């Protein structure tokens, strides 16, 4: 076990912390035992008592000694270890109904896993867990992650399961794997996500579904005929919709409202979008993604990328969301529907050292949040604005204490709305309960290798892409800290701090 210990992170029901010893400000900001990481390693009182009992009973009987040793081993799981990011892999992201038109979720995630297995020599190894998910799934995607594992050279004994939290799926998968590693339940695992809108499931009307189920259980010809008579042509017209069930509005329509509320200009959105494309194009030219991407189906880079993008060119596009002259959101400053997959290899420090792998960074804190976008009319994609300050408070950090900011660019206006909220005294006081604004960030540290506006956004795959990118950035710098923020459907937000 690692020497690094802390109080049980489950004490805060809304957040978790995988311990890191690199955030020096935390010790001075610590208010209660459950708010942040202790400055020095500390043994759990339960574990210490167990060790004492084990010694005192050793002279009495071998049976009690064995029992105490076993209990000591079990109690060692209360020791929280640092969680290392070893590396990541993804396939190039592709615009919907294009290069990956004939690829399924399983095809894409299997290819991503195979690339990760090859890069880190995981052939034949039994990992502790593989956790991944997809937002859009067919019924044939039952047990998808496990089936993908069985398609790879990982040992068949590697367990796997699916999860889903909309656009936060990939990062949330990393949290689950990290928790198991931190608690000593596993040594190594993979977290990831995949999505395709090219191969989206098409649902029929509920009337047709019920008629077909009735037809399936019918025992006589008369019963079958009765079931068939219940089929109505209108039940064949229920096309897939990209909207919130509670409001009927799409993400773009929701964000158009938020952009208007925060006064986000068209020019600022286009500038952010153009910058994302330009920075990602430069990153490709520099070879930054060479060890983060596995070519797939003829692509070796994201085909949404527009290296020649400029704010002037984007300004010529017509608005796609919003109404009238106030509409500012276009196809150019919004992410397109995208297909792709990503995965990240996480491990304990001990496993990394034993297997000869360099640690890129450590996951130290993470937080999830949700807003009431139905009754309180909060912005659908503004939950990260709430998650980040809670996470900063536990970490004993300020918004300015970061070398990199990796903020998911679902829409340029979403990023800008969030940043503006953190600078706004009224929002920070009335919504966040803070005495003063969080303040502004150094924009030169924002999405320095480009982000979703350039790469695209396969919903569940975005978290893995961002986590792997941030970890590599920190490792290249040698030391540092990155803030990760991802908004998600349903009024949710998933955020993390990684450092080295």
Q: Where are the model-predicted features located?
A:
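Condensing-enzyme catalytic core mediating Claisen C-C bond formation in acyl metabolism
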Residues: 72-103, 227-234, 240, 315-386, ...
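Active-site pocket-shaping loop/turn-to-helix segments
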Residues: 91-114, 118, 137, 161-175, ...
């Amino acid at each position: 076990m690692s020497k690094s210990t802390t109080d049980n992170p489950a004490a805060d029901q809304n957040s978790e912390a995988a311990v890191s010893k690199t955030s020096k400000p935390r010790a001075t900001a610590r208010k209660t035992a459950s708010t942040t990481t202790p400055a020095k390693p500390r043994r759990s009182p339960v574990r210490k008592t167990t060790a004492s009992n084990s010694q005192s009973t050793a002279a009495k009987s071998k049976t009690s000694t064995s029992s105490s040793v076993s209990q000591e081993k079990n109690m060692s799981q209360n020791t929280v270890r640092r969680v290392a990011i070893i590396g990541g892999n993804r396939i190039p992201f592709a615009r919907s109904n294009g290069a990956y038109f004939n690829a399924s979720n399983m095809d894409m995630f299997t290819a991503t896993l195979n690339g990760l297995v090859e890069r880190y020599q995981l052939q034949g190894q039994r990992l502790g867990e593989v956790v991944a998910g997809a937002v859009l799934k067919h019924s044939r995607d039952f047990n998808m992650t496990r089936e993908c594992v069985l398609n790879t050279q990982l040992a068949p004994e590697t367990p796997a399961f699916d999860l889903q939290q909309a656009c936060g799926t990939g990062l949330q998968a990393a949290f689950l794997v990290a928790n198991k590693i931190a608690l000593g339940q596993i040594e190594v695992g993979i977290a990831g996500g995949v999505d395709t809108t090219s191969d989206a499931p098409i649902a029929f009307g509920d009337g047709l579904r019920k008629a077909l189920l009735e037809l399936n259980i019918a025992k006589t010809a008369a019963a079958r005929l009765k079931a068939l008579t219940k089929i109505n042509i209108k039940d064949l017209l229920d096309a897939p919709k990209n909207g919130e069930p509670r409001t009927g509005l799409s993400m773009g329509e929701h964000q158009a409202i938020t952009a208007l509320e925060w006064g986000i200009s068209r020019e600022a959105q286009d500038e952010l979008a153009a910058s994302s494309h330009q920075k990602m194009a430069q990153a490709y030219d520099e070879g930054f993604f060479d060890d983060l991407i596995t070519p797939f189906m003829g692509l070796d880079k994201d085909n949404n990328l527009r290296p020649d993008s400029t704010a002037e060119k984007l300004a010529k596009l017509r608005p796609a969301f919003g109404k009238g002259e106030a509409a500012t959101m276009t196809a150019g400053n919004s992410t397109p529907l995208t297909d792709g997959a990503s995965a990240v290899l996480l491990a304990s420090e001990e496993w990394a050292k034993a297997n000869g792998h360099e640690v890129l960074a450590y996951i130290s804190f993470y937080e999830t949040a949700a807003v009431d976008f139905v009754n309180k009319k909060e912005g659908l994609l503004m939950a990260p604005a709430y998650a980040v300050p809670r996470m900063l408070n536990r970490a004993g950090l300020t918004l300015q204490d970061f070398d990199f900011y990796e903020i998911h660019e679902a829409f340029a206006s979403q990023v800008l709305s969030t940043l503006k909220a953190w600078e706004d005294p009224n929002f920070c006081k009335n919504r966040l309960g803070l005495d003063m604004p969080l303040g502004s960030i150094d924009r030169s540290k924002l999405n320095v290798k480009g982000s979703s506006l350039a790469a695209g956004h396969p919903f569940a795959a975005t978290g893995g892409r961002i986590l792997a990118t941030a970890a590599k950035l920190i490792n290249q710098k040698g030391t540092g800290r990155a803030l990760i923020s991802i908004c998600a459907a349903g009024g949710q937000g998933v955020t993390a701090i990684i450092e080295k």
